[in-house]
Amino acid sequence: KDLLDVVEKIRPDFIVTYRHLHSEAWRWPYSLGEHLDVLIRVIEAPVAIMPHPDREGVPEHAMKNTGSVMAITDHLAGEDVLVNYAAHFTSLGGTLHLTHIEDEATFERYVDAISKIPEIDTDIAKEAIHAQLLHDPSEYIDSCEQVLKENGADLNVVKHVTHGHKLEEHRKAVGENQ
């Protein structure tokens, strides 16, 4: 409650904190911690969540260097605010990774529904929808790169657009680009 009162009084535009704030539960990597869980649900300001400072295995450069920044969300297209934040965090000459993962399980559920409509050729629909779902975020990333360059941003944009299991693909993208 004290933390929420302070945040409400100050009304910051942006918050940077770490997982398991005011908690000893940081040893268990599967939650954000009770304070942070409440904070991100009740405030409107965006929150950058960093690893707990006592956590082992965090690469040393992760807390000192932002030469490689990855924007991750469910659907990247239209997320201008997220892209802008990520671009601002990327060091001059650094790399901004823009990531869109189309969830395979959701896609297959829709294809299954389409397959039950006799008037629609399922194979054609599956192929066309799949291509379009990957094309849209790819075009969006291209437009982001163009706008960033037009505005003088000194960074490289790397596009990650794929489909699969979201968590696995996000882990893979992060692991390959550390």
Model-derived regions, located:
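A structural motif corresponding to the C-terminal end of an alpha-helix
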Residues: 43, 143-158
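Small/aliphatic-rich secondary-structure junction motif
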Residues: 1, 65-127, 149-156
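Short, glycine/charged-enriched secondary-structure capping and boundary segments
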Residues: 29-33, 62-64, 84-85, 111-113, ...
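Gly/Ser-rich helix-loop-strand patches that form or flank binding pockets
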Residues: 3-59, 169-178
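Charged docking surfaces used in two-component/phosphorelay signaling
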Residues: 1-2, 161-169
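Short, surface-exposed alpha-helical segments at coil->helix boundaries
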Residues: 134, 138-145
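Amphipathic coiled-coil/heptad-repeat helices and related helical stalk/stem segments
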Residues: 32, 79-82, 166-167
